[in-house]
Amino acid sequence: MAGAEYRMGAEDREEYGEKFAPDKNEYGELLGHSILFYIKDTGCPVRFEAPEFALKEVEELIPRLRNPEYFNTSQHGCKYWWLEYGGRLDTIRDTEKIKFELWKIVYGVWNHIKNSGKFPEMENYTLEWVGLFPGKRESRRFKGYYMLTQQDIIEQHEQYDAVSFGGWSIDLHPADGVYGTGRACNQWHSKGIYQIPYRCLVTPDVDNLFIGGRIISVSHVANGSTRVMCTAAHGGQAIGMAAAIALRDKLKPSDLIDKERIGELQSALLRTGHFLPGERFGRGMLPPTARITASSEFALRELHPDGTCFRLDCSAAELIPVSAPVPVISLTVKADKATRLTVELRSSSRRGNYTPDTTDKRLDFDLREGENRLTVDFGMRYDAPQYVFICFMFIHI
């Protein structure tokens, strides 16, 4: 409608070398819509009579109803995101058709819960509300000056014109949605957040047009991450600031792509508290030259226990900030029987990440049954301030 070039559906794997690109026939090319619903405990038994349009034989048609990972009556709210449909249709032109199918599904599932006799614990619950508009995950994606891809997300490529960021996994859903037999989604998590460049928010085809939200210039795979609401809103903030600068200086949106001008946009965003990965301060900001003084100080030397012991049913870690030497840690460990406790010092391979993917030091402690007092001294120091992980991992003898 605007006259700008756009795409709809998945790219071939060979176009960008994206290994996560789906098989278009088997997996599908589009993510579907979902409608959420709200249930309420009334405190007394409530009957439910399903409307005529409610889906019948839901257990046969929706295999995941037999999978407790996806379906159990203790789950509420967004846990039913997988009631999804429309990935095999046109998610723009067929949206009304998709909505009515989702209504059939929701009322059919609720009828199954209330009237199959398998869920007596739901006797007092009523279906309080069903959404009127489906949540949309994917439709058109416009072509900008840059196309963000899987590699930009996973490898966390640096962008000179970064104005936003994302942190959701690459989250793709099979086009068959709720009627599918496999997993309801496939996710690939980056080791940290990634930058979104301004070039993804501007199209070369229309001089005075910004693109934002789910329709920015990204591949189908990358859209699996950038499509979520907080990421879309963060990009919208960048667009709003860019529009203000363009109006003030009588510029076109594309003029701000210039490496000199983009710095002004980034600085303006930073001054409002807008976070940009890798960018600490904008032009003319005071923190780089500021000095902080205090009339007194308190050095924290000990953290007293404030509860019972934390049971290590699985490995666990403590995330702590360090500025040079790693502090020596003393702690009490209780063992049900003689065993070995491995304590690892881990860090992230990239500054700004919070993934313990680098093991810097490992210590082993033989524990006797009962109470053990341990002193953990890694003898390590780091050149720059960062977060590190103290990881407690059991290796049974």
Model segments located where?
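Structural beta-strand segments of beta-rich domains
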Residues: P327-I329
